[in-house]
Amino acid sequence: MSLVEKNTASEDAFALSEATARDYLVLLKPRVMSLVVFTGLVGLVLAPGHMNPVLAVISILCIAVGAGASGALNMWYDADIDAVMKRTRKRPIPAGIIAPNQVLAFGLTLSAFSVMTLGLMVNWLAAALLAFTIFFYAVIYTMWLKRSTPQNIVIGGAAGAFPPMIGWAAATGEITWDSLVLFMIIFLWTPPHFWALSLFTTNDYEAARIPMMPNVKGELSTRRQALFYAVLMAPVGVLPWVMGFAGMFYGVVSTLLGLAFVYYAWRLWAADSQPQMLAAARKLFRFSLLYLAGIFAVLLFEALTFKLLAAFGVF
């Protein structure tokens, strides 16, 4: 073994000895994972029919582990730009806590475990969707789109939109128009959400040479496109009620939240000064989180209520 190899091995051993369970948890991107698990749960509960509770828990755990695996693989590949950006430079790899090869092995192991477990215990359609989601996020988005096009978020947003479809497929073994609508809500929500974020973190993305929309097309174009996607998303958000797999309460809430989303996006587009624009971007970003959490929470509440009433013979 050469001196360089010995030094590398000793550095890896040091990194491993310093790493804690919390550091490995950070690799899983728990905040992102929580949203993925939540939307996956909604898809599973909203799906027609009854699923064995044990299999339902296994499905959600597999979705969570698969999401975490995607996060770990993303951090492995993006370690160079994470070291440059202020909000990511303390992640385990750039901070020197965990060696890159260990993160790669961790991510690949979790990926294989989550997909195989979901396939063997639940069904292979859900497993195939989970495998494709991991591949799409880790390879298509992280390794290709993120560094090559300002449309990275638009196309790459598909990865974050699959969880409710996976939950639905786990419960039914099918892909239906209903599950595709859930996919489209998140898919159309993603661009204005992340473009609002990028407007007040422009310097970070520029330093890392990531071609986010504000850095490539300019702030005005970004604001215009954020409004465009908000206008597209608002009516799609009401479709679960229109199509009959959500109730009137959801219809009212999704309509009001959708109109509010468009309003905040319009405020961003109409801002006529830099301070106003930055303030509007932060407000849109925060409200976008409330919007997605709100409509999926109502979907979950209605689905659980209807199934509980059905169990007692009310319906």
Curated annotation (Swiss-Prot):
Pathway(s) served: Porphyrin-containing compound metabolism; heme O biosynthesis; heme O from protoheme: step 1/1
InterPro entries: Protohaem_IX_farnesylTrfase, UbiA_prenyltransferase, UbiA_prenylTrfase_CS, UbiA_sf
PROSITE patterns noted in UniProt: UBIA (PS00943)
CDD domains, sorted: PT_UbiA_Cox10
Transmembrane segment boundaries: 32-52, 53-73, 93-113, 120-140, 153-173, 180-200, 226-246, 249-269, 295-315
Keyword Translocase: no
Compartment annotation: Cell inner membrane
Gene Ontology CC annotation, any one: plasma membrane
Enzyme class per UniProt: transferase
Alphabetically ordered keywords of this record: Cell inner membrane, Cell membrane, Heme biosynthesis, Membrane, Transferase, Transmembrane, Transmembrane helix
Chief localisation class: membrane
Reactions that this protein is recorded to catalyse: heme b + (2E,6E)-farnesyl diphosphate + H2O = Fe(II)-heme o + diphosphate
Gene Ontology BP terms: heme O biosynthetic process
Gene Ontology MF terms in the entry: protoheme IX farnesyltransferase activity
Enzyme Commission identifier(s): 2.5.1.141
Bilayer topology annotation: Multi-pass membrane protein
Miscellaneous remark of the record: Carbon 2 of the heme B porphyrin ring is defined according to the Fischer nomenclature.
NCBIfam families: cyoE_ctaB, PRK04375.1-2
Family listed: Belongs to the UbiA prenyltransferase family. Protoheme IX farnesyltransferase subfamily.
Function: Converts heme B (protoheme IX) to heme O by substitution of the vinyl group on carbon 2 of heme B porphyrin ring with a hydroxyethyl farnesyl side group.
Name of the protein in question: Protoheme IX farnesyltransferase
Annotated gene: ctaB
